[in-house]
Design a protein with these regions (language model features):
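Hydrophobic alpha-helical transmembrane segments
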Residues: 1-59, 181
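Start (N-cap) of specific transmembrane helices in multi-pass transporter permeases
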Residues: 7, 11-15, 98-111
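Non-transmembrane, extracytosolic/lumenal segments of membrane-associated proteins
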Residues: 47, 107-223
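Long, hydrophobic alpha-helical segments
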Residues: 57-77
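Transmembrane helix boundary and interhelical loop/hinge segments in multi-pass membrane proteins
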Residues: 73-87, 92
Length: 370
């Protein structure tokens, strides 16, 4: 059985590697062409375009891993079935259960690799790509309204809430366009702080540059409220928001790890903010490596198809269509779940469960009746 395992794994892994390399080459070319639009602007050269495309590769590999596994495994198994190698292995004692177990073990190994790439390598690459673009673009802008953060301090009648708006980040990583609104327990605006830029220290203290502070005394009448204004070149503003939470609000979701997504979702929940999108993203990222097991199970029935059921190229084409349909269903489930407010883990797990049931049903039917 060790020889059988070595034979199967060698062919499957080499096929998966070839498919992954082909996909990565295609996506690298597309990203490189896209980066060429900014060459010549603010000192950006073609080498920066090439480097930016390289930084995107780990993220593409993470997204393409299940599809590459499906296509590569189908190609290897279909080729073995057409050359009667798989038939010889079955005659030698490779039963359906044992074949499924061998592929499941290989799928588990690829699931671990996918998790490592998605949680450690891809976020670093995405952050480096964002930093490279921000350096030549003069900063990173966060949508039209910027990024919003909320914070609560105190308790009971002394509770105050803070709404923080960030326009984006500068080329050096400093926060830009900072606006901080403080409200009392009755929802009245107590103070407003605006600053050109600022940085967040590890202890949560914000160092604001060119800060303007406006205060409205809560005891005064609305029409006669004296406004106190103060301008400071440097202002230290204490906060309970960690640098990780601030970074999560400003940077794209692709730069966040599974743990960071969970922590940010918990922060949003504690501040009574919408968490559905981030919870769905967390569960999709947490369960995505399991798609490798599903793709292995989905590829196995192709080994039990008779050679007359189609050539290897036709079966590979079928695998490509299955992979595309899985990606479409996975993305569609996320958008529909967000619109319909479905349970996040159900939204993330449904596509993989459906394709797993489909693969097991096809595998059982082929083993019994073919």
């Amino acid at each position: 059985m060790k020889t059988v395992r070595r034979l199967l794994y060698r062919d499957i892994v080499s096929s998966i590697g070839f498919v992954a390399l082909a996909f990565l080459s295609l996506f690298y070319f597309i990203d490189f062409v896209d980066e060429l639009d900014d060459v010549g602007k603010r000192g950006r050269t073609i080498w920066h375009a090439m480097l930016g495309a390289v930084f995107e590769l780990p993220g593409h590999l993470y997204e393409l891993m299940p599809i590459a596994m499906l296509i590569g495994t189908i190609y290897a198994l279909a080729r073995m079935a057409q050359s009667s190698e798989f038939t010889i292995l079955r005659t030698g004692g490779l039963g359906p259960g044992r074949a499924l177990g061998l592929l499941a073990s290989l799928g588990a190994a690829f699931a671990v690799v996918t998790f490592v790439i998605g949680d450690y390598v891809a976020p670093i690459g995405e952050r480096m790509a964002v930093e490279l673009k921000a350096r030549f673009a003069g900063g990173l802008r966060v949508g039209g309204a910027g990024a919003w953060l909320k914070e609560r301090r105190g308790s009971g009648s002394q509770e105050h809430s803070f709404s923080i708006n960030l326009a984006g980040t500068g080329a050096g990583g400093a926060l830009e366009g900072i606006r901080i609104f403080e409200f009392d327990n009755d929802g009245r605006l107590v103070s407003r702080v605006t600053a050109r830029e600022g940085r967040v220290a590890p202890d949560g203290v914000w160092t604001l540059q060119d800060a303007d502070v406006t205060r409205w005394p809560a005891s005064a009448d609305a029409g006669d409220a004296p406004v106190h204004e103060q301008r400071s070149a440097t202002l230290a503003w204490p906060s309970t928001l960690s640098p990780a939470v601030v970074a999560a609000a400003v940077l794209p979701l692709a730069t966040m790890t599974t743990v960071e997504l969970w922590r940010y979702s918990e922060h949003l929940s504690d501040q009574a903010q919408a968490t559905q999108m981030h919870e769905i993203r967390f569960w999709k990222k947490a369960l995505y490596p399991l798609a490798c097991l599903v793709m292995m199970a989905l590829a196995l029935p192709f080994a039990y198809m008779h050679a007359r059921a189609g050539s290897v190229s036709l079966k590979v084409f079928g695998g490509i269509m299955l992979g595309i349909s899985f990606v479409l269903l996975n993305n569609l489930a996320g958008h529909v779940g967000l619109l319909r407010d479905w349970t996040p883990w159900v939204v993330a797990a449904t596509p993989s469960l459906l394709y797993l049931l489909l693969s097991l049903a096809a595998f059982t039917w082929l083993v019994r009746y073919r």
